[in-house]
Amino acid sequence: MLPVIDARDREAVHREAEALRRWHDGLTEPLKVAMVYGGGSQEDRLYLAHCPPEQRSDTTLRRSLTEIGADFTVLDPCDPGFVRSLPAFDIALPNLHGPYGEDGRLQGLLDYLRIPFCGSGVAASAVCADKLLCKRFMRSVGVPTPDWQVWWPGQKTEWPGRPVMAKPVLGGSSVGMSLVQDVAALVPALEYAWACDPSHVLVEEYVVGLPVTVGVLQLPSGLLVFPPLATEAIGAEFYDAEAKVDTNGRGAVSVTAADLPAAVRTDLIRHALALWNGLGCGGWARIDFVITGTGQPYALEVNTTPGMSAESNFAVGAGLAGLSHADVVRAILHEALTRRPYDVPLPTPALGAAAEVGETAA
């Protein structure tokens, strides 16, 4: 396991940022970065439809990549030439969410093509994107998570007698998710979730408390756990898709440093690190919790491709820890490029030919 850097030690954080700048300044040529971004999932299409360009994560990432002098190109995974374009780049920076973006499928493609990429690998991405698998893993390592049931289409449903969250098993940004507080709302909530993921629905006990999120960033000398953030939707029942994705309503969302007792903060960091290490996350991640009135944290989800707009939870947490947006970008590029290098050739002649095309284009 990697050492942990205390976010309260500003000198240590500053040293890490300086080490990243020296590493990047020592590169002989600008990095050729493929930022993978587009509307491949319902979540991303919703984001593109509702978020003004100036507030989107790709705009902020473009700004930071320009600041650090990277030679970057935005590649749309829906473009027919997407796969053939990839070998021309030194590294891929996925900026996608939901199925085909952060669920291990894109990561598997990049891994197969021997293209370094930012963020977690295939296994961690796949498990974290599947809420059911992730909750089972949480339980297996002793991290508290709300009780749940799994319901399939056509299954007889019974009101559990207490409020629950109905969630699609795959996908994020609360798309397809509903708070169900009475029996009349149960069937519409299930149908809404099934419309997003027709396989099965996670019906999770609704835990009343303070929503908190914790960012984790892999730096050259270890893991930095950001100060916990309290994330509350004002005037809404919960932090729903509209609050997360529709930035025109950002005034209805409160994101602040969480004022927590030392013992609760310690528990949060311990649980976040247990999930990071146990799942084998890499680069960066954001773990969402809810804290009850008695100070008990319950883990909800692990996000392996956090949103990176200027006002995103991850960027705000990094700022509280003393890092700029450009520092975070350097960190995830550094982590991806300093992993164990590939030492075997491309596995098929077809992929070898694709690599040659990329080399010629370069």
Q: Where is each model-derived feature located?
A:
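ATP-dependent carboxylate activation and anion-phosphoryl transfer catalytic cores
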Residues: M1-D25, P261-A362
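ATP-binding N-terminal substructure of ATP-dependent carboxylate-amine bond-forming enzymes
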Residues: M1-C118, V122-A123, V127-A129, L133, ...
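Active-site nucleotide/adenylate-binding loops and adjacent lid/helix of ATP-dependent enzymes
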Residues: M1-Y37, F72, P87, V127-L210, ...
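A glycine- and small-aliphatic-rich helix-loop capping segment at beta-alpha/alpha-beta transitions
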Residues: G108-F117, D182-V187, L320-A321
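Phosphate-binding site of ATP-dependent enzymes
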Residues: V183-R270, I291-Y298
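Short small-residue beta-strand/loop micro-motif enriched in glycine and branched aliphatics
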Residues: G119-S120, S173-V175, G251-V253, S309-F314
